[in-house]
Amino acid sequence: LTAPHPQLIAIGSIDPQTRGIKGAIAEIERAVKQLGMKAINLEPGFGSPPLKADDALLFPLYDVCDQLGVPVCLMSGPTSPALEFTDPAPLARVARAFPRLPIVCYHGFYPYVNEVIGIAFRYENIHLVPDMYIFLPGGNYYVEAANGFLADQLLFGTSYPFRAMGQTVEDYLRLGFRDAVIERIMHGNAERVLRLGV
């Protein structure tokens, strides 16, 4: 789908519960090596049964992504089947076990904003994409953290189609990010994490 559109990048989604571990690993390798996908998306809290990010079933997938040099993207918002699967505490175990693996957290583990910011402070391989949740109560803490230590760990996102892309760009630019960090948030961090210049 993205081949005719060089301005787009592809991210592969893998469900180890439907494919099995060997099948999931094979699909990750195919997605990265053959299809040129830039990251692998996992949605553990939406599995059947739902899993936490540090479930042992996921560790072989983290390992192969680490070996291939591609980030893992985790779905981490309040729409999971139960809020316990949005708790970011298990994320710390994954970040500690795979310190070179970039972990990109869609929806920024909202509503656990302060907790995930604290974990990201400890583990520089954690990257937050608060997307539409940055506009909800408590979202200002993402901005405050990005204006300090989190400048290289926050990435822009929209949650499209739930929020219009153009409007989200305009709204992000009005959130109060310092001039020194806004370029990183809007594109520089994503370019680095996804290795788009490589």
Question: Model-predicted segments: where are they?
Answer:
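Mid-domain alpha/beta scaffold segments of enzyme catalytic cores
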Residues: 1-56, 64, 126-127, 191
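Structured beta->alpha junctions
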Residues: 16, 83, 134, 160-161
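Residue-level preference for long, well-ordered alpha-helices that form the structural scaffold
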Residues: 20, 54, 83, 178-179
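Short, surface-exposed amphipathic charged segments that create phosphate/polyanion-binding patches used
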Residues: 25-30, 143-146, 197
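Mid-to-C-terminal alpha-helical segments outside catalytic/metal-binding sites
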Residues: 30, 150-153, 163-198
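Conserved, mostly hydrophobic/aromatic
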Residues: 31, 40, 65, 107, ...
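Catalytic pocket-lining loop regions of alpha/beta-barrel enzymes
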Residues: 35-39, 48-155
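A generic structural motif
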Residues: 42-46, 131-133, 183-188
